[in-house]
Amino acid sequence: MNYSIHRLWYFLIFLACGFTAVAQDSTIQIVFTSDIHYGITRVAFDGASKVPSHVVNVRMIAAMNTLPGLRLPADQGVRAGEVVGPIDYLMITGDIANREEPPAQSAAASWNQFNQDYDQGLTLKDHRGRPLEYLLVPGNHDLSDAIGFYRKMTPRTDPTSMVGIYNRMMHPAVAKTNATWHFPADKINYSREIGGIHFMFITIWPDSANRIWMEKDLSTVDAHVPVVIVAHDPPDGDAAHFRNPNGAHDINRHDRFEGLLEETSKDVQEPMGKEDGKPTNDAFEQRGFVAFLKAHPNIKAYFHGHNNWNQFYTYSGPDHDVHLRTFRADSPMKGKFSSKDETKLSFQLITIDPRSKTLTVRECLWNTDPQHPGKAPVWGESFTMGL
């Protein structure tokens, strides 16, 4: 009898240990950054001035590589207090290449530097011991490099970074080249099922044209499956990114619409005025997106870059009639705050528990002591939400 009891006891212990391992292994972890802007320099970094983006990104990559050995903060979030462990994905929401306005380098040079630094420098592995997977969307700089801009660029167009992102994410049977890639036919819109969550990755912003693709994509998703949108622009968009409503609808210095979205601006815009002025009103277009959100209440969160600072907030729409949990990422090169104070440089770690459909986003401050560049990253803000 005692022998049988002991066997049962050991079996229960084995099961408990197994369930603990499964619980940890079932979590999904994503490093999230944005606007890495290869091709320009930071005013100051680590005691030096005019520091190239290559140098800054290599330092950020080194900080990312330390994540698996760090312990998560005791913030009541997913896996709080546990060792981070494997990282499954790296998510970058665009502006990999800076716009090639002199003296910035070409998109081709920037894309090549990105590949070299990240592909060779990142050592992070997923739960199966494989190199992590990239989740990329283009930014306004990547796309302007490809289709042109209203100020001088050298060369005038270079779609290399758009083509590179397209081939990495869309996996075409025949890889696109700079000669065979065309906009808007070759948008970078795709989705992934990650931990029981449907992630939608969108070119620039979910305008009316992109929402046609999104609607079709969501038609295959059960209404009870949580959905997350990932794009470069914030939920309130950027009015300058729409198609020019004037004249030939082109990209020109007078109107300063950038033509990055297929949807034509329908809002009355303020006069441009000063030389660097640009369109600012996109309330009409936002209302179309809000209607889409209301039609799909399983859209639970939105991740983006473009504005260049770390923020966890709620998007409420131009009429304050929707509530979408939103996460904005810092830029290592052009941070609104971190460009002036490098101790505020950050990326985010997203940890997802697929069983409870819970997501925690944690700010990771990676340069809090510039005098000691190898110092481990420090946890900042965190936010946990149910999906």
Where is each model-derived feature located?
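Bacterial N-terminal signal peptides that target proteins for export
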Residues: M1-Y10
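Bacterial N-terminal signal peptides
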Residues: W9-G18
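N-terminal active-site segment of His-dependent metallophosphoesterases
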Residues: A23-S106
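Short, solvent-exposed loop/turn elements at domain surfaces
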Residues: I28-I30, Y38-A44, A209-W213, G335-K340, ...
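Active-site neighborhood of phospho(di)ester-bond hydrolases with catalytic His/Asp-centered motifs
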Residues: F32-S34, D88-D95, R130-G139, I202-T203, ...
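Short mixed-charge
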Residues: L67-P86, Q120-P131, V174-A179, G288
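Extended active-site neighborhood of metal-dependent phosphoesterases/phosphodiesterases
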Residues: R99-E215, S219-P226, I251-D267, A295, ...
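Active-site-proximal segments of metal-dependent phosphoesterases and phosphodiesterases across multiple
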Residues: R211, D222-I299
